[in-house]
């Protein structure tokens, strides 16, 4: 059980919450702050003070005063009118993450909701009732209005949820679980939808998957090094310390560990003086992608614990301030950076695939074919990889450089952070498939070299891979092989370890 405080949530905890289905509870001290802040909102309504989103309309309607008797209707209307999401729904892990992150930000005690609202969010998490949230429709400021409105709908018994493997009306799940829908009171609708939790939840899931792929890429690249009789000298610690990037040093160190007892890697001058860049520069390129991942993780953990509501309430109500913490620019930049980092991991992987299949670049059978000419072998797998990396180059165009005005120019600059987050996730899926193709080719190359000559770690990884796909003894439908390996890579990492096979290092 993870305790949410509003301040301490980590990516590692989110792994357990999203991928293991661990439950959540609220810190009592934080809940007390929520209750105290709520008293301020109720006093504002009672006194008839003019405060944005509590006693006024929203966006361009911020100058329209709302009567005390209409405050509840204002919040309900807000949720219904803003539930304009379109397209396919986010994965369940993402909508689960949105519930968790929205509760966590409320636990900072500056949003002004009742404890009841926080508890309802946590009930949905713990009972695995996940909102159906369309992926498209967010500008990323004022936060993820449309996606979070679909999240808020289900608390009211409206909209749809994923529940026990089915997509059902929210009331079906609430009734079965014995829960009553809530009625929103002053500010609560705004507090539910003003924030960056859609882009951040998708970003967290993307980061988790990207981190796993980055570790896996080192194992796969190591297997390729063996298949191509790569030169291990280029991974010498002195080379990488001389440059000074810790991530580069760490990648080189891990690959040295992976290949320490391999009989297939070579020494400088043994077969050739130096390798092509896609082998020789693995630490430099993969290390740079790790720099991206480290940056992204840092920004995500800040945003996961951030107050992104508006207005925010401080000093016991002495300050109720309209600000712009809902603006998704920090996450938009981070997601665009993640896109570039993962696209490059795929790019260099595709170049290694080419070196594995091109008979002009190695001494292996052409296209790793069992009968070159009669059978095409891995020829078209390289085409597929080339297609994926080219698609990634289009998706890697930064969403964050775009902006378009909304709400009659009141909201005249937006982040497009959710678009960046969604595209990052697609790039990661594509990159995983490219790595799957490299792994299939590297395993085949290793067989030509002799499995007995592989390192202990790569041999273990090879045998695990061969449980997913057989050797290429005849041409077959390789699409199935690629998807099988890609699915295995997606699920073949432990929550507590970097990667099952890597835990032995």
From Swiss-Prot:
Keywords: Cytoplasm, Histidine metabolism, Lyase
Known pathway: Amino-acid degradation; L-histidine degradation into L-glutamate; N-formimidoyl-L-glutamate from L-histidine: step 1/3
InterPro entries assigned: Aromatic_Lyase, Fumarase/histidase_N, HutH, L-Aspartase-like, Phe/His_NH3-lyase_AS
Cysteine pairings via disulfide bonds: none
CDD domains: PAL-HAL (cd00332)
Localization per Swiss-Prot or TrEMBL: Cytoplasm
Source organism superkingdom: Bacteria
Catalytic activity entry: L-histidine = trans-urocanate + NH4(+)
Example of a GO cellular component annotation carried by this entry: cytoplasm
Swiss-Prot/TrEMBL GO biological process terms: L-histidine catabolic process to glutamate and formamide; L-histidine catabolic process to glutamate and formate
Top-level enzyme category: lyase
PANTHER family per UniProt: HISTIDINE AMMONIA-LYASE (PTHR10362)
Family of this protein: Belongs to the PAL/histidase family.
Protein name stated in the entry: Histidine ammonia-lyase
Organism: Bacillus mycoides (strain KBAB4) (Bacillus weihenstephanensis)
Taxonomic path: Bacteria, Bacillati, Bacillota, Bacilli, Bacillales
Gene name of this polypeptide: hutH
């Amino acid at each position: 059980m993870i305790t949410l405080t509003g301040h301490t949530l980590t990516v590692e905890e989110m792994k357990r919450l999203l991928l293991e289905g661990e439950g959540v509870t609220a810190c009592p001290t934080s809940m007390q702050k929520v209750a105290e802040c709520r008293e301020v909102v109720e006093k504002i309504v009672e006194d008839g003070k003019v405060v944005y989103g509590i006693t006024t309309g929203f966006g361009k309607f911020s100058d329209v005063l709302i009567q005390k008797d209409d405050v509840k209707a204002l919040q309900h209307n807000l949720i219904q009118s803003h539930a304009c999401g379109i397209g396919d729904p986010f994965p369940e892990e993402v909508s689960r993450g949105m519930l968790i992150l929205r509760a966590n930000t409320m636990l900072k005690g500056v949003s002004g909701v009742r404890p009841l609202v926080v508890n309802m969010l946590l009930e949905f998490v713990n009972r695995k009732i996940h909102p159906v949230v369309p992926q498209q429709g967010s500008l990323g400021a004022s936060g993820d209005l449309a996606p979070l409105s679909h999240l808020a709908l289900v608390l009211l018994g409206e909209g749809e949820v994923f529940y026990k493997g089915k997509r059902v009306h929210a009331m079906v799940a609430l009734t079965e679980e014995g829960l009553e829908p809530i009625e929103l009171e002053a500010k609560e609708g705004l507090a539910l939808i003003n924030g960056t939790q859609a882009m951040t939840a998708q970003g967290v899931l993307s980061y988790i998957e990207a981190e796993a792929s980055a570790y896996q890429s080192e194992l796969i690249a190591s297997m390729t090094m063996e298949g191509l009789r790569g030169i291990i000298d280029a991974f010498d610690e002195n080379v990488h310390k001389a440059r000074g990037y810790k991530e580069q040093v760490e990648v080189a160190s891990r690959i040295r560990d992976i290949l320490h007892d391999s009989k297939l890697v070579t020494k400088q001058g043994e077969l050739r003086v130096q390798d092509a860049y896609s082998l020789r520069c693995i630490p430099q390129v993969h290390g740079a992608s790790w720099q991206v991942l480290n940056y992204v993780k840092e920004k995500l953990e800040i945003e996961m614990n951030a107050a992104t509501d508006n207005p925010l309430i401080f000093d016991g109500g002495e300050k109720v301030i309209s600000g712009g913490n809902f603006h998704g620019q920090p996450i938009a930049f981070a997601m665009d950076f993640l896109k570039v980092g993962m696209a490059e991991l795929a790019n260099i992987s595709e170049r290694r695939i080419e070196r594995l299949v091109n008979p002009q670049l190695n001494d292996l059978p052409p296209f790793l074919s069992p009968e070159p000419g009669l059978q095409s072998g891995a020829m078209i797998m390289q085409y597929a990889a080339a297609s994926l990396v080219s698609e990634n180059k289009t998706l890697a165009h930064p969403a964050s450089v775009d902006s378009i005005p909304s709400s009659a120019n009141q909201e005249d600059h937006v982040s497009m952070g959710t678009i960046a987050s969604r595209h990052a996730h697609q790039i990661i899926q594509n990159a995983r498939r490219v790595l799957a193709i490299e792994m299939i080719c590297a395993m085949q190359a290793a067989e030509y070299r002799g499995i007995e000559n592989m390192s202990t770690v790569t041999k273990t990884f090879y045998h695990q891979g061969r449980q997913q796909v057989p050797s290429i003894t005849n041409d077959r439908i390789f699409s199935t092989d690629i998807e099988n390996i890609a699915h295995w890579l997606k699920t073949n990492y432990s929550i507590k370890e970097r990667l099952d096979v890597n835990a032995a290092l």
